[in-house]
């Protein structure tokens, strides 16, 4: 999987840009505010239908335009595909894959699997469980085709159940939804568990490279006591749920626990070590996708020199290039990346005031 051509129009400060990236490592450099991160953001937007920097997608549309347009031609093990996305300031979004209109943004994610390593992505360990659930669910979505439907049903049922709780409904009116919730919760949990088990096997070797002599254990918690039947728990917690107006236990409370001995990694490791652990998690996820589905991820790595020292930059870039995946890396100074590579970047782009040029 690699992007052969990328077209960006009216995205942040980029009026128009066309890139013909390499299948290997692409270095994008420029001053702060030049638009180099916007190139990565545009690629992510094309794959996810949203930004990794802002929940308000309208903000990514260039200030003097009413819509943005993104297009990419990509090659994969089944041949080639063309992906296009147009986002209007009023929120309307149009997506086409090989000329056909696509209604679900999940189809984009399936077509263009993207891994992001940015200053924001370190929230995976520094913040609450939501980011870790999203990490697990990215992998579960790509590894098992039944996950998306099951998880969509869980979210739909929880929304209905929570509305009934806020309306003060009796448990008799909620019982039907509980039976449905239990059914899909078990399916979601089984897929998540299986995915984390598979990820663990790959992760051990990568962590040994990044953090030698640090013994990290990883476990998945499903969102309720593993010894308790969810149906019985939902019934016993009805009064509590009624008081809070939402469902306290269930698959929406799942988490990925990472520990060193008896301590959470957040308490046992330095901030630099935690960043390396996040990088290891992202690389393992990409490797597992390749192993399970013969599909490469595309890696977007933003502002690497400000996040890792030279030694660890070198280690991360070595691990990334060894995956064989297409990589886009940004930096203010190209030397910060070039000096950390065993061989020169496959392609170099310079960005200045939203204009992207290739450096021969």
UniProtKB/Swiss-Prot annotation:
Keywords: ATP-binding, Cytoplasm, DNA damage, DNA repair, DNA replication, DNA-binding, Nucleotide-binding, SOS response. GO terms for biological process: DNA replication; DNA synthesis involved in DNA repair; double-strand break repair; SOS response. Its main location: cytoplasm. GO terms for cellular component: cytoplasm. It is found in: Cytoplasm. The keyword Lyase does not apply. PROSITE patterns: RECF_1, RECF_2. The keyword Nucleotide-binding applies. ATP binds at residues 30-37. Pfam families: SMC_N (PF02463). It comes from the Bacteria. One of its GO terms (molecular function) is single-stranded DNA binding. InterPro entries: DNA-binding_RecF, DNA-binding_RecF_CS, P-loop_NTPase, RecF/RecN/SMC_N, RecF_2. SUPFAM superfamilies: P-loop containing nucleoside triphosphate hydrolases. The RecF protein is involved in DNA metabolism; it is required for DNA replication and normal SOS inducibility. RecF binds preferentially to single-stranded, linear DNA. It also seems to bind ATP. Belongs to the RecF family. PANTHER family: DNA REPLICATION AND REPAIR PROTEIN RECF. This is DNA replication and repair protein RecF. The gene is recF.
